[in-house]
A protein has these predicted regions:
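RNase III-family endoribonuclease catalytic core
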Residues: 1-132
């Protein structure tokens, strides 16, 4: 198994179950190429919800004067591909994602959709490994 200590340091979280982190970093192109039968898409699904919840909870507590509609708009601006892509770049997530050869050759490690999806998957992995 790959040593993810550098990524864990950037995340500020050490995984008890390293397989969860490995799965979060497994792009479908890599899974298909290596016939693994598993990739990060299901974790991405959960990560999106976890990020939405945590952001909503934070905004609810910090922006007590804003009505629901404004909170929703603000959450949407914070939890979007552009923001998640930026967070993924801050921790150099692209250098840890396992991509298939074709995806790698076409710049997948720097593609906003790939990085933002992997970031959501990593958030879900943290959630399942240690809770919120």
């Amino acid at each position: 198994m790959t040593d993810y200590s550098e990524l864990e340091e950037k995340l500020g979280y050490v995984f008890k179950n390293k397989k969860l982190l490995e799965l979060a970093l497994t792009h479908s192109s890599y899974s298909n190429e290596h016939k693994l039968g598993r990739d990060n898409e299901r974790l991405e699904f959960v990560g999106d919800s976890v990020l939405g919840f945590v952001t909503a909870e934070y905004l609810f507590g910090k922006m007590s004067d804003l009505p629901e509609g404004e909170l929703t708009k603000l959450r949407s601006r914070l939890v979007c591909e552009d923001s998640l892509y930026g967070f993924a770049q801050l921790i150099s997530l692209g250098s840890f994602i396992m991509l298939g050869r074709g995806e790698l050759a076409t710049g997948g490690a720097d593609r906003p959709s790939v990085l933002s999806d992997a970031f959501e998957a990593v958030i879900a992995a943290v959630f399942f490994d240690g809770g919120i």
